[in-house]
Amino acid sequence: MSILDYRRQFIEGLGFGLDRFQLDAIEAVDKRVNVLVSAPTGAGKTLVANYAIGRELEREQRTFYTTPLKALSNQKYHELCELYGSSRVGLLTGDTSINRTASVVVMTTEVLRNMLLTESDQLTTLGLVVLDEVHFLQDPFRGGVWEEVLILTPAAVRFVALSATIGNATFLGQWLNEVRGPTTVIVELTRPIQLHNHIAVMKRGEPYAEIHDLLDGPRLSNEARRIDNLMKSSRRFRPGAKWQGSKSSAPPPPFRAPRRSELMQALEREDLLPVIVFIFSRAACDDAVHQLRRDGLLFTKPEERREIEAIAEARLLDFSHDDLQALEYADFVDALRRGIAMHHAGMVPAFREIVETCFERNLLAVVFATETLALGVNMPARSVALERFTKYSDAGRQFLTSAEYAQMTGRAGRRGLDDEGHAIVCFASDLALHDVGRVALAPPADLHSSFRPTYNFTANLINHFDYETALDVVQRSFAQFENDRRPAGHRRPLTDQMIARHHVLEELGYAEGWRLSPEGQLLRSIYHECDLLIAESISAGVFEDLEPAALAGLLSCFVYESKRSSRATNAAKQVSTKKKRVHHDRLGQERRVSITERLREINVISATVREVEERYRVPHFKEPDGHFATIIAAWARGATLGTVLDLADAEIGQTSPGDFVRNAKQVADLCEQLGRMRHLTDVADVALEARDAVLRSVVAGASTVHPRE
């Protein structure tokens, strides 16, 4: 089929007209150049990717579709199965492998990076890579993976990169042009559904919350200015101000923040449901759901409640009664039946998936969510509300950035269902509305690199390239591209970081000049932020002669990171002696001592590595943290979820089921990596047993891809 015939057939099959930016992007795809599309959430970027995938299928070339999150990969897998048929689509997410040799394979970006570093034979007929959510390139922990993929993918492979709106798309395109060849940059700034910004406020003495326009075109609305002025006048007469009058005579402020039930009732009156309410605390999300239940709010009809129950029961068939009890399932499903839910990383993945399915089917009126939802699965709503316009960071409480505001409000407005989307900011007495307006009207933020050479990456460069070529690979990074354009006094070549890591590897015996030792070859296959420490621990025999559960516990020290060690320690001290003794007996004191001794060995190794790193000014990896060890060991020995969560409360402070599952999954991933090292026969076999012991019940449920009904 000719290009024009295919294009015509594709567009006619959509049943709706395309926007100008989509037509321009499709034309660029047909010219067989790389394409970068920067457009608002919901604008239809995915359509460009679907067109490019179809063209590759016509040419009998494979496509890899990468996403930053397993949840997004699962969602995209289902979408592409519906488009092209399940026989032509596969899924690879590290813990899930479906039809891996398919013509179109969806995967997390790390999976593709690992394929490139191991020179997988899966790459032989690869024609196209779709990099979805390429703005993750700036993620401080994982963003470097996107650059590694763009640099290392064979030159013949083309890219379609999809990004949320960024301010420096042209600059990013210039870099892509250098590392990937001819690249067309498509920028769309207009939202497909117009966004209206509002303020939710309670007037003193009024019974109902009010929703007012925040903006009038490119400026603050008259009502917003009036609220600001009245609050400014009020503050002059409030305690703590410079006014010298009597505190008792100060009038109450004219406005206050609406309570959660008041906000929901106002949104329902204004026909602004369903809504996602962003709250920057998991506990506050849970509290919000509890408050609405306590206040008796109900947004569903009987037939909707029955459908919600059916969705939840079908997803949780494999969960035991004890697990459901530990997860407080009864409270969760009662809220769902009312059309109310929460969505955050503290929930087990199965519960989050139930919320997503119910919301997708328009069965929920409100979801209280942390901002991770804005970065995750596609879940648009008619409205988005922000309970506060500030959040805590390392620098204290700060305003949301324009990028954060745009990311969250990008969920407002459902294409095909809503003519307009609505963003509602809840009033706060310490919030000036002109600050909200300034952020809402700010241009898109620029994208910046977070790439830094790791030990694993350096080892793979040594293995694959000569010294000069390896330097060139690092110099081709977006980080170096940005660095080269800074003022002369502020530049530091990234090659210096790679060279420093090479010196560390030489001193520790992983490299002899520009050649890897057997230990260096081992390091190449470890994909983790503690890659060198794990390799050193393997070489020292720390993982030998352990039972599977103890090995899982030991590996957790590379995964787990105490949020506040002091708080966890205090929490453990407050647990009764009786409760502690019960946990120790269940685990077995002898087993516990075995893990503790090995943890000491790892800490000694860590200190040695740090001394070498300090000499070469290499940033340290995270400290090993053994607080999760006895918890995951108990789980691997068959303890129930309730027992393990009780143990976690005693050992490290209150732990959510979602946090437990996430850490357990990461331990299982490390077990899988050790299990693939067949030259370590005994350790590899035990590691695979440990993986299987960890991947059960709710943890295994997080790995499952469930078909859509």
What role is predicted for each listed range?
Residues 1-35, 216, 220, 300-337:
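Helicase-associated low-complexity/disordered flanking segments
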Residues 8-11, 16-201, 274-279, 286-300, ...:
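Conserved P-loop/Walker A NTP-binding site and adjacent catalytic elements of P-loop NTPases
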Residues 64-66, 74, 81-90, 278, ...:
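Conserved C-terminal RecA-like helicase domain
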Residues 151, 158-160, 165-291, 341:
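Conserved interdomain linker/interface between the two RecA-like ATPase lobes of SF2 helicase motors
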Residues 157-158, 379, 383-439:
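Conserved segment of the helicase C-terminal RecA-like domain
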Residues 350-359, 449-554:
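C-terminal accessory/connector segments of nucleic-acid motor ATPases
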Residues 532-605:
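Leucine-rich, amphipathic alpha-helical/linker segments
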Residues 586-709:
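C-terminal amphipathic alpha-helical interaction region
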